[in-house]
Structure formats: C-alpha cells, structure tokens
Amino acid sequence: GTFFTYTMYGFKRAPFTYQHRIGYNYLKGFMYAGIFPNYDGRRRLYLNASISSPRNFENFFGFGNNTAGYKEEKKNYNRVKLRTYMFNPSFEMDLRKEEVMTFFGSLDMYKAKRTDDRYIYTVYGEDHPIFRTNYFVGLGATYRITKQPYSWLPLLETEWTAGWKMNLKKPERNFPYAQGSLSWNVRFSDRFTWASLMKGTVLFDNDYEFYQAATIDLRGFRENRFIGKQSFYQYSDLRLDMGKLKNPFTPLKYGLFAGFDYGRVWFPGERSHSWHTSYGGGIWLTFLNKFTTKYSWFGSTDSFRFAFELGLGF
C-alpha cells in the first residue's frame, strides 16, 4: 500500500500541531489517521477511519479449537468477503511517565458477501443476517504501562483493555469483553536478544459475530484459523544482530531470528485439550535506523507460511 502524511508545525508543537495520514492498501482499502496533540504533549486526540476495498476478506474455519484446516480445498473456500466502514475516535492521556490511559469509541459497519461454494454456507444459511448490513457501536478503555520494575529485569510493557460492543439493528446482541497483553525484550548482549508477547481475550457473552470472536495469532497458521469465546497465545523470538551493510545510500542493519508460538481458543460446548504451535525463522533488515522489513517462514500442523512485514522498530 501507499501512504501520504501531512504534518502541521504551528506555534504549539507536541511535537507537532496536528497530523493527517491517508493511505490505501490493495486488500484493506482506504485508511485515515488524524493525530491532534495537546500543547503540552500529555493528551492526544486520535481519529481513525477506514473503507475496505472490494478485495477485503476474512478467513472463517468455524468456531472452536479443533476446527479442520480443509487442506484439500483451495484457500478461497474459507475466505469471506467483507465490506466494512469504520470510524474509531480515541482520547489518550499520560497519567505518569510510564502510564497511559486511552478512552475509545467505535462505529463500524460490516456486510459479509454471499459467495457460492464457500465454507461459510455450511454454518450460516443463505438468508442469515450475517449477509446483511450490520452496524455496531462500541466503547472502551485501555491502560498501558511501560516500566522496568528492577534493574535486573527487562523493560516490560503491559496493556489492559475493557470494552463493550452492540449491534444497532439488534440491541439485544451485545457483549462486554476484556483483553490483556504482556511483552518484554531481554538483551543478553549487544547482538543477542529475546523478545516475547503474551496476549489473551475474553468475551463475556455469546452475542458476537465470527469477525468479532477471540482469536490467536500464530505465524504458522492462516489468520483467524481458530476463533472462540476466549483465547490465549504467546510468540517469542531469539534475534541475532549480524552487523551493518556498508552502502552509499542509507545505514542498513541486518540479522537473523528464530521463533516459536503457541496458543489456543475456548468455545462453549467443546472439550479440547490441544495447544497449537508454530515454529520458524527468517531475516530482518533495518534502514534509516527506523524502518524494519522482516522475511519469515513458519510451519505448523497445517502447512508452512511465508510472510513479509514492514514496520517501525523490530
């Protein structure tokens, strides 16, 4: 995708007066992000909006921890085309140096497209409301703390979210939810580090749609491979900094990493003791001391997956 950023540096900067970011992704569609910081930089208003592209889809393998992978079918069999419009404002405030509190709202529209010969038809009938336009409102709050408790411990970041969503057409279909995560980065030497993230989600009612369910992010499986009412997963990487590549254009660092993931979901009425795992590794490149690209290959009981990522930091 491509992005355009416009930043205004007025009299009051924290570090800027405001910023607009507009982008387009081939699969996800159009996206907008606006940042409006307070003059002292301790409070910020965010406005996020998106309109999906006609190619946007979400995987659906059914509910539960033991769903089949349908390896004999083509990938499209488990794909559901989704038309979405989203508007998500949020207000962020610094409580202390290490603590941030965010209050957010959401107004979302979802419509799953009817497509013949797809798995979703075996779960939902042709006239099911999932194939009509559904509007949702939501409210919530997130507390995040980044701190090093003791000098001998790594820097820890933990985040806790509590929220609620409701279907505007059917107000009785609403549910509260909670999420929690913990991440850390242990540096054994200048070149060798261990990074890890643990994350869990709990839905406190059964009135949610498949695209709102709790899921796990294991790199050897397709997205939303397992969904349910509760979820937990952890992924970890061992990273080796191989040094710098000399070139006349930009500073370029590179390295190797190996990773291992595990997790599972829980769904009412299902008895499962399985924990899913994936493993693999890859290479990373950092340029301008800011942007990192990752090329990875992860395997699981389903298959192997190649992934390319571009982002800030590692």
Report residues per predicted region.
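Small/polar glycine-rich anion-binding or flexible loop at a beta-alpha turn
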Residues: 254-261, 274-278
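Outer-membrane beta-barrel channels and translocator barrels
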Residues: 9-11, 38-42, 96-98, 148, ...
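C-terminal outer-membrane beta-barrel translocator/porin domains of Gram-negative envelope proteins
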Residues: 30-31, 60-62, 73-77, 89-90, ...
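Membrane-embedded beta-strand positions of outer-membrane beta-barrel proteins
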Residues: 20-24, 45-49, 101-105, 160-162, ...
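Transmembrane beta-strands of outer-membrane beta-barrel pores
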Residues: 1, 6-8, 24-28, 49-57, ...
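Gram-negative/organellar outer-membrane beta-barrel architecture
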Residues: 1-135, 212-216, 228, 292, ...
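Short, glycine/charged-rich beta-strand-loop motifs at protein surfaces that mediate ligand recognition
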Residues: 266-272
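A short alpha/beta connector and helix-capping loop motif
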Residues: 272-287
